[in-house]
């Protein structure tokens, strides 16, 4: 995902440290006197100029030219896409297959046209493209497959600009903050990049996340242009169902651009899991500013690095089980504080270090805590009840909770059941939990969906669902995807059975809280509480036994 690049040689701020050979730049220990500077206060109607508060050398004329060019690219590409879609959708075709082929070709042309604009504009446009690439459950595959290319095409910020950003945001340059700073980034993403460094007068190595300076400068205009494009699409195509995406981007981007929020999320997650027996490890936060985050440096391999696990005798099946526990705890645990982007690049695996509390011979390291969602307690309980009724297939109750959680009508219920389980609705009673177990079965199922037009129906349904519900479903899907990437032997059933136990606990805790807060006599509370407790223990034991059965069946039989 991340790209590497060559850095320019900088001699103004630092020099090589003579006593130690290193790939890092070592700074002189002589303190420097710096003149005081002030951040320019830009107040006015222009939201674009508001972003320039972080730049001392802001040039309004130059910025106006750059902004105009960026906006022109978006407007031109938008106009060409509108024209293309209008022509294709307004034409007559001999058959539905011919129409679908023409529409597919149009999707591909417009996606490639947009890709070029995203690459040229950079910044949040690359972030938008990356979001689109992960939305195969809502938008056509021609778009998602095209946007995947943006995962490893993120431009980097020069060391000179990073030093300047440090001076603006902290009053100190890199040489006053670190003894060593690796000029080669550990990773470069659309909004920021990460470097390894050693703290001043210390042996402590840290990871330094630095926001690209151009992002805060251009993001107000970019967000406005994004909303304009979506509104224009809605005007030309009233049936367009993705206006929510513009709302989601406007909501999430400010959170991702504020690294103090990321630090807060990281600390809260670390504290939440501190009392649990888990292999999860969250790096310690040293300090943060809105555009700078300094945290503990943790070396590890990507979670999908199978050779690393095999070399270190790490069980892929146990890793998959632990990941499932971690994210179900986030969804159904107290507080409902959910990490929204658990893809392979944000989850590392490392051998268990000394003094670790992990019950395994490894730790799972969770990174990038910039985007979280707080799940309301009522939604937690309803979502838990929905999944329990899916697993036990109580159709009446399932329809009730599907309507509460996802606003799904009885008419669309079969489509919803297919979307959330990955299996035909009619087979829910007979097939084992987890859906098709073999790649060939999955291909046949997807092919049948496409031929029957069910895939388009699923996409339309998902685009109308509440955003938070869709996010929960996406997280469940990402956990299943990580399990597939690990190529586990224990089968997909375990993921659902583990989730079932968290759902049980969530529903049980809610019942007990409601009971003790009710005005019933204490004797009635004791009897009801005992009944709830026994029911919970029995059901939990049932799912645990089923989980162990499927585990040993796939592993040893």
UniProtKB/Swiss-Prot annotation:
Membrane topology field: Single-pass membrane protein
Superkingdom field: Eukaryota
TM regions (residue ranges): 40-56
One annotated GO molecular function: kinase activity
Pfam families: ABC1
Mitochondrial matrix side: 34-39
GO cellular component labels: mitochondrial inner membrane
Segment annotated as transit peptide: 1-33
Keyword Ligase: no
UniProt record similarity statement: Belongs to the protein kinase superfamily. ADCK protein kinase family.
UniProt-recorded name of the protein: ABC1 family protein MCP2 homolog
Lineage of producing organism: Eukaryota, Fungi, Dikarya, Ascomycota, Taphrinomycotina
């Amino acid at each position: 995902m991340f790209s590497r690049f060559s850095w320019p040689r900088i001699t103004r701020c630092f020099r090589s440290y003579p006593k130690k050979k290193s790939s890092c730049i070592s700074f002189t220990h002589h303190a420097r006197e710096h003149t005081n500077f002030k951040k320019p206060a830009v107040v006015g109607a222009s939201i674009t100029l508001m972003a320039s508060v972080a730049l001392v050398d802001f040039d309004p004329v130059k910025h106006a030219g750059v902004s105009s060019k960026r906006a022109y690219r978006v407007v031109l590409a938008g106009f060409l896409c509108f024209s293309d879609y209008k022509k294709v959708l307004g034409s007559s075709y001999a058959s539905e297959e011919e129409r679908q082929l023409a529409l597919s070709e149009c999707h591909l042309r417009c996606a490639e046209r947009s890709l070029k604009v995203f690459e040229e504009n950079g910044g949040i446009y690359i972030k938008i493209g990356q979001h689109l690439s992960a939305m195969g459950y809502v938008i056509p595959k021609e778009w998602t497959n095209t946007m995947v290319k943006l995962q490893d095409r993120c431009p980097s910020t020069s060391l000179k600009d990073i030093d300047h950003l440090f001076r603006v945001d902290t009053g100190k340059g890199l040489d006053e903050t670190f003894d060593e700073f690796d000029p080669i980034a550990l990773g470069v993403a659309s909004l920021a990049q990460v470097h390894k460094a050693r703290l001043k007068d210390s042996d402590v190595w840290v990871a330094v996340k630095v926001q690209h300076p151009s992002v805060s400068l251009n993001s107000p205009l970019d967000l406005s242009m994004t909303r304009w494009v979506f509104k224009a699409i809605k005007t030309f195509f009233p049936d367009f169902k993705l206006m929510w995406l513009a709302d989601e981007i406007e909501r999430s981007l400010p959170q991702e651009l504020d690294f103090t929020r990321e630090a807060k999320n990281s600390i809260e997650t670390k504290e939440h899991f501190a009392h649990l027996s888990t292999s999860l490890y969250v790096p310690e936060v040293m300090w943060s500013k809105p555009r700078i985050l300094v945290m503990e440096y943790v070396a590890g391999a990507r979670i999908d690095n199978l050779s690393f696990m095999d070399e270190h005798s790490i069980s892929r099946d146990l890793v998959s089980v632990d990941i499932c526990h971690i994210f179900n705890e986030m969804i159904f645990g107290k507080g409902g504080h959910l990490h929204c982007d658990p893809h392979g690049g944000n989850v590392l695996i490392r051998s268990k270090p000394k003094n670790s509390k992990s019950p395994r011979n490894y730790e799972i390291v969770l990174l990038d805590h910039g985007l979280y969602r707080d799940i309301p307690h009522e939604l937690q309980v309803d979502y838990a009840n929905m999944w329990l009724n899916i697993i036990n297939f109580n159709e009446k109750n399932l329809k009730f909770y599907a309507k509460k959680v996802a606003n799904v009508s009885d008419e669309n219920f079969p489509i919803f059941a297919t979307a959330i389980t990955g299996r035909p609705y009619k087979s829910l009673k007979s097939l084992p939990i987890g859906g098709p177990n073999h790649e060939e079965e999955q291909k046949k199922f997807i092919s049948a969906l496409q031929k029957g037009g069910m895939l388009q129906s699923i996409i339309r349904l998902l685009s109308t669902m509440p955003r938070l519900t869709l996010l929960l479903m996406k997280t469940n899907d990402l956990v299943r995807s990580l399990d597939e990437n690990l190529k586990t032997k224990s089968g997909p059933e375990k993921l659902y059975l583990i989730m079932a136990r968290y759902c049980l606990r969530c529903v049980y805790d809610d019942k007990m809280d409601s009971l003790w807060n009710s005005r019933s006599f204490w004797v009635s509370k004791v009897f009801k509480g005992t009944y709830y407790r026994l029911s919970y223990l029995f059901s939990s034991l049932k799912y645990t036994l089923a989980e162990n059965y499927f585990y040993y069946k796939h592993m040893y039989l």
